[in-house]
C-alpha cells in the first residue's frame, strides 16, 4: 500500500513530497491509468462513465440487492500531500483484493460476497469550475455550470457526450443501484492522534456553505485622498472577515466553523486606496439551520458594512449543501469490525466534506477515519503511519464483508 501510494504521488505537477494533480491534467490521466491497472490486476471488472468516474466491480451472488460501493478521489489541490483521497481508492482496492484472496485456500472455503462490491475513483473536479460530483448526484446542478464547460473539459480527454444534459443522464444513479457507500479517509484533524484512538467512526458530515462577497469603492491616491473622503473596499472586506469570526463564535458551538479563505484587493498597490475587494467565505456545521443562521448573519453584516462605508456590494451564495448523517448500518458495521480486530474507536463528526457527502443523496453512506500526523492535510508533509493505514484497510475490508452479507464462517471475522 505504501509503495502504491508513493507511485501514485509521483504523478504530480510538483516534485515529491508535494502533490499537485488537477482533474483531467496529464498527471491525472496517468494516475487513472495506474489505478485501472491495479483494478484489473486484482480481477475487478473495470468501467468508466461519461463523466470520468472509474469503477472496479467484483460480482456477488445477489444481483438484486444493490452494490456495496467504496472509494474516494485522487485529484489533489496544489502543493498537497499523498494521502488525501488516494487512501480511499488504493486502500479500497487492497481491501477488496484481501477479500478475494480469502475466497479459497488449500484447506478451506472462506468468504463469498452476496451483494456485489465495487470501487469508485470519484471524478471530483474540485479545482476547476465544474462541480462534477455534485452534477453526478444531482443533475439539476447543470443549470449552475457555464454553458458547454463540462462537455468541453470532459471531451478533451475522451469522456463526455454531445450535450451536458446527455452526459449527466448517462451517469445518473438510480435509486437502489447502491446499497451502501463507505469511504476510507485520513481524518484531516488532530483528534484521533491526540486521543490515541485507532479508528474514527464517522457519524455525520458537516454541511458546507460557500459565499462570495465583492465590495467596490472609488479608490484613489494613497497620499492625495483624505481619510474622511475614502470609501475603502479593502477595509470593508477586513471588517467582514472579522464579522465571520464573530458570528461563528457567537453560536457557542465548536461544530460551527468559518473561514475567509480568499481575500483579494485591487489594484493591490502600496500607494493606492483599494478600489475592489473580493472575499470567498466557507461556513460549515453539522447543524444545517445553525449554519444557515450564520450565513444570514454574515450577509447582513456585509450589507451593514457596505452602507456604513459607502461601498457597493455584490454577494452570492455559491453553494449551501445539507449535512449528511451516516447510516446506522454502516456505523455499526465499522464499529463491530474494529472491535473484532481489537482496535479502539471514537465516534466523530467530519468537519471536512468528502465524496460521501454527495453520495448520501443517493445511498446510505458512512466513513472510516484513520489518524494523520498533527491533523495536517492539504500540505506536502501530510502523513499517516503504515500501521494506521493497515488498520483502516482491515476495518474497511471487514465492513464491506458485513454490508455485502456474504458467507464467511464466524471464526474468520
Where are these regions (language model features)?
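Short beta-alpha connecting loops at secondary-structure transitions
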Residues: 265, 284-288, 318-320, 375-388
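Flexible, glycine/charged-enriched surface loops at secondary-structure junctions
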Residues: 47-49, 105-106, 165-171, 224, ...
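Alpha-helical metal-binding/catalytic segments enriched in His/Glu/Asp
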Residues: 70-73, 79-116, 209-215, 221-247, ...
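Zn-dependent metallopeptidase/amidohydrolase metal-coordination segment
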Residues: 1-14, 71-72, 345-395, 403
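His/Asp/Glu-rich mid-to-C-terminal helical/loop segments that flank catalytic regions of hydrolases
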Residues: 203-205, 221, 225-250, 295, ...
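Midchain, well-structured core segments that form catalytic/ion-binding scaffolds
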Residues: 124-126, 131-289
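Acidic/His- and Gly-rich active-site-bordering loop/insert found
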Residues: 1-80, 99
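A short beta-alpha structural unit
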Residues: 22-24, 259-268, 280-286, 312-331, ...
Amino acid at each position: 500500500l505504501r509503495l502504491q501510494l508513493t507511485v501514485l504521488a509521483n504523478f504530480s505537477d510538483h516534485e515529491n513530497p508535494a502533490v499537485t494533480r488537477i482533474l483531467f491534467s496529464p498527471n491525472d490521466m496517468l494516475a487513472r491509468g495506474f489505478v485501472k491497472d491495479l483494478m484489473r490486476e486484482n480481477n475487478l471488472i473495470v468501467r468508466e462513465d461519461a463523466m470520468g468516474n472509474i469503477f472496479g466491480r467484483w460480482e456477488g451472488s445477489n444481483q438484486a440487492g444493490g452494490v456495496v460501493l467504496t472509494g474516494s478521489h485522487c485529484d489533489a489541490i496544489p502543493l498537497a500531500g499523498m494521502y488525501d483521497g488516494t487512501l480511499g481508492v488504493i486502500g479500497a482496492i487492497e481491501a477488496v483484493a484481501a477479500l478475494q484472496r480469502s475466497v479459497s485456500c488449500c484447506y478451506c472455503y472462506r468468504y463469498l460476497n452476496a451483494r456485489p462490491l465495487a470501487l469508485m475513483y470519484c471524478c471530483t473536479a474540485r479545482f476547476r469550475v465544474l462541480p462534477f460530483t455534485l452534477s453526478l448526484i444531482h443533475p439539476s446542478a447543470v443549470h449552475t455550470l457555464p454553458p458547454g464547460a463540462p462537455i468541453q473539459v470532459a471531451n478533451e480527454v475522451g469522456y463526455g457526450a454531445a450535450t451536458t444534459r446527455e452526459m449527466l443522464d448517462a451517469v445518473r444513479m438510480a435509486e437502489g443501484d447502491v446499497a451502501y457507500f463507505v469511504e476510507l479517509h485520513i481524518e484531516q484533524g488532530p483528534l484521533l492522534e491526540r486521543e490515541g484512538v485507532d479508528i474514527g467512526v464517522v457519524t455525520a458530515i458537516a454541511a458546507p456553505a460557500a459565499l462570495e462577497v465583492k465590495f467596490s469603492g472609488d479608490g484613489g491616491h494613497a497620499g492625495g485622498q483624505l481619510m474622511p473622503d475614502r470609501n475603502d473596499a479593502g477595509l470593508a472586506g477586513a471588517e467582514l472577515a472579522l464579522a465571520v469570526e464573530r458570528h461563528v463564535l457567537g453560536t457557542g458551538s465548536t461544530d460551527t466553523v468559518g473561514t475567509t479563505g480568499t481575500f483579494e484587493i485591487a489594484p493591490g498597490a502600496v500607494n493606492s486606496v483599494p478600489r475592489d475587494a473580493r472575499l470567498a467565505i466557507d461556513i460549515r456545521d453539522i447543524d444545517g439551520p445553525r449554519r444557515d443562521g450564520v450565513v444570514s448573519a454574515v450577509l447582513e453584516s456585509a450589507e451593514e458594512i457596505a452602507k456604513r462605508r459607502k461601498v457597493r456590494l455584490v454577494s452570492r451564495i455559491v453553494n449551501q449543501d445539507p449535512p449528511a448523517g451516516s447510516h446506522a448500518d454502516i456505523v455499526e458495521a465499522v464499529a463491530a469490525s474494529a472491535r473484532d480486530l481489537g482496535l479502539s474507536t471514537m465516534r466523530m463528526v467530519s468537519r471536512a466534506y468528502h465524496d460521501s457527502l454527495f453520495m448520501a443523496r443517493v445511498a446510505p453512506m458512512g466513513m472510516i477515519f484513520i489518524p494523520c500526523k498533527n491533523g495536517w492535510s492539504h500540505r506536502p508533509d501530510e502523513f499517516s503511519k503504515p500501521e494506521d493505514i493497515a488498520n483502516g484497510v482491515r476495518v474497511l475490508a471487514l465492513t464491506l464483508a458485513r454490508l455485502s452479507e456474504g458467507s464467511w464462517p464466524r471464526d474468520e471475522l
